[in-house]
């Protein structure tokens, strides 16, 4: 771990703001996990109480025919059809996109989390609980399920900020943006004044966003760490872990966008070049992201080959 590389990165105010905002989202995710876990269980119990026939003794009869694909799901048995109806009844976006591909419908009678994933963004099929999800997945669940009684405008404002963080090609945000983000995330947290673990993170986020991180590069005989004006010490490895987690989430987001063809190949290529250039200049970060980077590059290469092949088919052969 190279302290001087970290100091150089945080010497860029806009990158430091990006890391601060991302760190807030990590804190938000952590404080929401227990609350979400309890509420998902409560929601599932409520569904079973309202429609007892959907309970643990109900069995999917459709087998593989009841397997959803992305946003498409046509149940082939009565149990899955009734579950789909109940999920849509509680879905705020019931007439829009529902990512059924996240779910294993056969588990809906017994597994509350499989039901919850129908209210979340794409790409979560392998997630087994809130502890494995990022902030936007948990925020989307709160926003999309009518079990959660909140001001949804406040939720969508934070989701929008998160997307701006992850879609920032150069991983930078301005101080003005950060102040606006602080207002929006605090407005959201104020919706949960009766949830102790969420209340507890409010002051931590406030301190984090209003302090000016002062990086201390220690001498050889000093302890290996970075001193912050908030009065606590974060080791180089802790800051490194925060950066890695944010960059990993960014690469995973880019992968999903590429897989769903939500971005043009040249846009993916440009963003990929920026990230590779950044990691090339920051070797202390690069090693922790090799697998995610290779996965994205491999998918991008497949798309490029397919695009070239399609273009070749469309080009008429010249006559000799």
Swiss-Prot record:
Keywords: Methylation, Phosphoprotein. Disulfide bonds: none annotated. Residues 299-320 are annotated as: Disordered. The keyword Phosphoprotein applies. It holds the Pfam family DUF4559. It comes from the Eukaryota. The modification Omega-N-methylarginine is found at residue 61. The modification Phosphothreonine is found at residue 315. Residues 307-320 have a biased composition (Basic and acidic residues). This is Uncharacterized protein CXorf38 homolog. It comes from Mus musculus (Mouse).
């Amino acid at each position: 771990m190279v302290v001087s590389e970290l100091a150089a990165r945080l010497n860029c105010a806009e990158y430091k703001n990006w890391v601060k905002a991302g760190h807030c989202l990590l804190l938000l995710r952590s404080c929401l996990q227990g609350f979400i876990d309890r509420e998902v269980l409560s929601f599932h119990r409520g569904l079973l109480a309202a429609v007892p026939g959907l309970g643990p003794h109900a069995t999917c009869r459709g087998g593989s025919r009841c397997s959803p694909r992305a946003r498409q799901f046509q149940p082939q048995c009565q149990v899955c059809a009734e579950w789909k109806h109940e999920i849509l009844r509680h879905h705020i976006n019931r007439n829009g996109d529902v990512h059924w591909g996240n779910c294993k419908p056969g588990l809906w009678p017994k597994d509350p989390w499989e039901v919850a994933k129908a209210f979340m963004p794409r790409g979560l099929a392998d997630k087994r609980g809130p502890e494995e999800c990022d902030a936007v997945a948990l925020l989307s669940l709160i926003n999309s399920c009518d079990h959660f009684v909140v001001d949804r405008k406040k939720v969508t404002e934070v989701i929008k900020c998160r997307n701006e963080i992850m879609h920032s090609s150069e991983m930078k945000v301005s101080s003005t943006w950060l102040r606006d983000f602080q207002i929006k995330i605090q407005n959201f947290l104020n919706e949960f004044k009766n949830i102790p673990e969420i209340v507890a993170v409010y002051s931590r986020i406030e301190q984090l966003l209003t302090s000016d991180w002062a990086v201390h590069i220690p001498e050889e005989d000093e302890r290996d760490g970075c001193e912050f004006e908030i009065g606590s010490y974060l080791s180089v490895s802790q800051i490194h872990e925060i950066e890695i987690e944010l960059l990993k989430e960014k690469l995973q987001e880019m992968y999903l966008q590429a897989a769903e063809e939500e971005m043009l190949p040249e846009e993916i290529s440009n963003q990929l070049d920026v990230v590779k250039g950044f990691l090339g200049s920051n070797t202390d970060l690069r090693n922790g992201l090799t697998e995610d980077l290779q996965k994205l590059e491999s998918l991008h290469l497949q798309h490029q080959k397919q695009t070239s092949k399609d273009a070749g088919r469309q080009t008429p052969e010249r006559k000799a």
